[in-house]
């Protein structure tokens, strides 16, 4: 949930602290939410089963899906179709053993992936991108930073220095 610095500290021309040791440390850190990430979800994604099911669902339901021209409208419809349950049955028949506890834990990610791919198939890449990013914490935080005009790092406040006084010779 945080970034640890192991390299030496350096100061930029405007006084910002940066660290050596390789890599780039972001000015703003947003922790990744891995709560719904399970072995079931990873296998479903990596095996291509989500893409295959979404393509099959799109083909089987194209006439109905053609009625939706807007991403949110299609998303609302898809949310009512119990796609995660349908996918779990499909995946089980195609070699991914049904794991109800893991499916429940990954429900939001599975639903987001399935709906997103169907939206991509029926609308376009822009609609898919908007759908996938609508509640992404990094996107939300980025918009908040821009809204607050804090997008670029500010020069650190100068440390007050004591005025130099010359020592009197004795």
Could you describe each region identified by the protein language model?
Residues 1-170:
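Conserved functional hotspot residues or short segments at active or partner-binding sites
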């Amino acid at each position: 949930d945080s970034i640890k610095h192991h390299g030496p500290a350096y100061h930029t021309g405007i006084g910002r602290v940066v660290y050596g040791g390789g890599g780039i440390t972001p000015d703003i850190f947003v922790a990744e939410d891995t709560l719904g990430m399970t072995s079931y979800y990873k296998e479903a994604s990596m095996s291509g089963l989500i893409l295959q099911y979404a393509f099959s669902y799109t083909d089987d339901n194209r006439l109905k899906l053609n009625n939706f021209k807007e991403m949110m409208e299609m998303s609302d419809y898809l949310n009512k179709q119990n796609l995660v349950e349908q996918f779990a049955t499909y995946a089980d028949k195609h070699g991914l053993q049904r794991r109800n506890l893991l499916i429940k834990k990954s429900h939001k990610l599975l639903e987001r992936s399935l709906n997103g791919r169907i939206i991509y198939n029926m609308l376009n890449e822009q609609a898919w991108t908007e759908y996938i990013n609508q509640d992404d914490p990094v996107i939300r935080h980025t918009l908040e930073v821009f809204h607050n005009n804090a997008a670029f790092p500010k020069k650190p406040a100068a440390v007050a220095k004591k005025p130099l006084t010359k020592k009197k010779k004795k």
